[in-house]
Amino acid sequence: MRKSGILLHIASLPNKYGIGTMGREAYKFVDWLRSAGQSLWQILPLSQTSFGDSPYQSFSIYAGNPYFISLETLEEEGLLKHKEYADINWCKDPRYIDYATMYENFYKVMRLAFGRFSKGRNGNVSEEYKAFVAENPWLENYTLFMALKDAHGGKSWCEWETPLRLRDVTAVYSAKKKYAKDMEFYAFLQFEFFRQWYKLKKYANDNGIQIIGDIPIYCALDSADVWCESQLFQLDRDRVPTVVAGFPPDAFSEDGQLWGNPIYDWDRMKQENYRWWVGRMSFAKKLYDIVRIDHFIGFNSYYAIPFGNKTAHGGEWHDGPKYDLFNVIKRETGKGGIIAEDLGIITPSVRKLLKQAAYPGMKVLQFAFDPTGKSEYLPQNYTSQNCVVYTSTHDSDTALGWFNNLDRKTKQFVKEYLGVRHAAELPEAFIDIAWKSTADMAMTTMQELCGFGTEARINVPSTIGNNWRWRTLESDFTAQSAAYLDRLTEISNRKPPVKKSRKKR
């Protein structure tokens, strides 16, 4: 069945309190998607972000981002008083997230909520909390990790004293006793996060909207996952990485890309029948309806850079687990529900892996406009319907911003191909050809639908300091844009069957 939808991260939803949350505005967005005839809502990883604010660098592959907890919902639950959070000036400009202000204020407010939760926990909530802790075995290691980070002033676990860094049994046991209350605080945050998330997901599903989630291929070095299961990564006896992930120098980057993530010990993972990945994918498939796996080509082969290098020079290519991993994942978690982010160098070996896995790959229209007209990303050249077409992604500029930075020859080709005369017409033309393509799924962004330029870009890869900040305003979600998208979706045969609307939250 042909489908379509919008890519909009939770953080980019509007509200008064600094960052998008799983509160009222998220439910309103589901209602808007329904009115626009859509069936998909794609988000970025829900993971708790670390320094740099990227959802692709997190303290845990399992833990949700506490910033997405709705403070208004906590007030409704009796855990907060309105004044305790409403009087805070969360941001100077509602268009952009101020992460420094969020960090300074959010956890203070949540400590107040936790205090009331601890005192008043009883009955159904108490049983629900106990069940949550019992059903999530990752929680103990994660909460201890966060408590210890606080105790060490936010320092990476790599800088902790040796017994804790190497997870000496006695040291870990003592830390659990010493920081039990802090661990419970972080468990409370996760309890509230997942409580709100699954209610929102159910509301979306009840209204015919599937959630497309996203998981990074690699873990951050400073994460509970690497600290607790160091044997699964290429680290030395002192838990220092021997190699890190990245991408070699090419025509676009003289020094290549140095991502810095530790690389998996795939031989060890295979010996354990990919237990770690099966657990991760099982969790992700519960969290989302469809899972987009970032940097899928890294499972075919990966570029390993010696730890300590300042650039990506000097790295080497190595074979990844290839289909062996996905064969196990399919057997243990089911066949469907995965999108492969297959952007990059597509070798015959990568094509073989994609064919074996049978996951839909991605087609980004901004990559399509080679003036020869032969690009595999142009809709006329798609060889399979088993793909997802995007007008743009979180890592690219908006269509308008992209167009404004093209050379004159390519601009002319784009205009001729799309049949537009002015740059302002481009975003709508992009959406039009994506929706009318043969791809099974078509996705655009709210930035595209609103016709925004580079000012609305989410992320510029390999840069830090000004990414992941852009947000929508309530005024962006117009009845006019919903009606336009609804009609386009209908004539493109992507509109889902009409269902009776479910009650609002």
Walk through the language-model features, giving the residues of each.
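Surface-exposed amphipathic alpha-helices with a cationic face
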Residues: R34, W197-N205, K330, L354-K355
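Catalytic domains of carbohydrate-active enzymes, especially glycoside hydrolases
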Residues: R24-T49, L287-Y288, A434-K436
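Alpha-amylase-like alpha-glycosidases and glucanotransferases acting on alpha-linked glucans and related
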Residues: H9, N15, D53-Q190, F194, ...
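C-terminal accessory segments of extracellular proteins
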Residues: Q480-K495
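Conserved, well-ordered alpha-helix/loop/beta-strand core segments that scaffold catalytic motifs
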Residues: Y186, Q190-C219
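Outer-envelope exported proteins of Gram-negative bacteria
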Residues: L44, Q210-I212, P216, I290, ...
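N-terminal regions that are enriched for targeting/export leaders
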Residues: M1-A11, Y27
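Short Lys/Arg-rich cationic patches that frequently serve as NLS/NoLS or arginine-rich RNA/DNA-binding motifs
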Residues: P497-R505
